[in-house]
């Protein structure tokens, strides 16, 4: 048996695992110390009341023969998929529920989605970046082109027409810089991707943190993106689902490469590789998109943003 030799090209350990091990060792050596954890973006507030209520209802459903649910649809419950599509409609993005795929979170999807692209692809990653982008492509054996996203370009790179790529990662608001891509910046990347026959993987995990009306929450607010983009989103930061695990992926029906529908390819992938996100989790996730759920999660997000401002000010005082 020949193993996947690409694993030997990975760093010794995943960044956040390494940070966790160092944190554990430090706290064991300094039991009285209090650390502000600024590694992996975990949350500290509990799930909002609307979600908790739905989770309780789902548990009760599972206790009775008439309301018990077994395997869920591999691509997600139709009701939740429709609810998420309606959420996009509020931003002027029209989606069919069949273009929405419920997942167990963005991290899983960011790795699994590479199944659609075959081997030895050229991938653009804007640095600094979420480490999983790099590691997933190293494992897949892809060629990675790192492009800087720093002060010199306002943390928002523009396409280089001399570089040909198959896959482009865009995260907005960006992890870790916080930079956002305005409509003009996204349009430039969409035009580039369509010209190059490339695919944009748009990571929208932090879209709920956007407050400005003129900043796109979704790449599909750029109409031409339907022929070149896949959007991956998570409820981890939106609604504190880091330990509950739920997200969603949007693949338009117009997205074709090599004569094949990537939407239908993903249906085939999910029906092979998953048995669906659990009934309990999807029931809880449905509450996030209700009027009350939206109000409650926004309250939590404001607390996190306030804490971020305090942390930033404290760091500046010590520079």
Where do the PLM segments sit?
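N-terminal small-domain helix-loop-helix segment of the aminotransferase-like
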Residues: 2-105, 112, 288-291
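A non-catalytic, amphipathic alpha-helix used as a structural packing/dimerization or gating element
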Residues: 18, 79, 83, 261, ...
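Helix C-cap/helix->beta junction micro-motif
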Residues: 30, 140, 195-196
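Proline-centered loop/turn at the N-terminus of a beta-strand
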Residues: 34, 122, 143, 166, ...
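Conserved core segment of the aminotransferase class I/II
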Residues: 55, 221-302
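Conserved core of the PLP fold type I
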Residues: 66-191, 207-222
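Residue-level detector of conserved catalytic or cofactor/ligand-binding positions
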Residues: 310-319
């Amino acid at each position: 048996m020949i193993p996947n030799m690409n694993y030997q090209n990975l760093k010794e350990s995943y960044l956040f695992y390494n940070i966790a091990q160092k944190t554990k060792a430090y706290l064991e050596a300094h039991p009285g110390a209090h650390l502000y954890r600024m590694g992996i973006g975990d949350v500290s507030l509990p799930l909002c009341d609307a979600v908790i209520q739905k989770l309780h209802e789902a548990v009760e459903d599972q206790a009775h023969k008439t309301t018990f649910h077994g395997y869920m649809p591999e691509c997600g419950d139709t009701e939740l998929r429709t609810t998420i599509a309606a959420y996009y409609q509020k931003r002027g993005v029209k989606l069919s529920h069949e273009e929405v795929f419920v997942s167990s979170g963005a991290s899983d999807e960011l790795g699994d989605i590479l199944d659609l692209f075959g081997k030895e692809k050229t991938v653009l990653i804007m640095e600094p970046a979420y480490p999983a982008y790099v590691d997933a492509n190293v494992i897949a054996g892809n060629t990675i082109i790192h492009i800087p996203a720093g002060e010199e370009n306002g943390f928002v790179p523009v396409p280089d027409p001399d570089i040909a790529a198959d896959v482009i990662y865009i995260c907005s608001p960006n992890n870790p810089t916080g930079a956002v891509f305005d409509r003009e910046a996204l349009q430039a990347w969409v035009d580039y991707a369509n010209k190059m026959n490339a695919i944009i993987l748009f990571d929208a995990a932090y879209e709920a943190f956007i407050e400005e009306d003129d900043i796109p929450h979704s790449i599909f607010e750029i109409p031409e993106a339907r022929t070149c983009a896949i959007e991956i989103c998570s409820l981890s930061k939106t609604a504190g689902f880091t330990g509950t695990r739920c997200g969603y992926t949007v693949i338009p029906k117009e997205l074709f490469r090599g004569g094949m529908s990537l939407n239908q390819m993903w249906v085939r992938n999910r029906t092979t590789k998953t048995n669906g996100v659990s009934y309990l989790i999807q029931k809880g996730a449905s509450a996030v998109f209700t009027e009350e759920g939206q109000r409650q999660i926004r309250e939590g997000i404001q607390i996190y943003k306030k804490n971020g401002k305090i942390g930033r000010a404290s760091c500046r005082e010590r520079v």
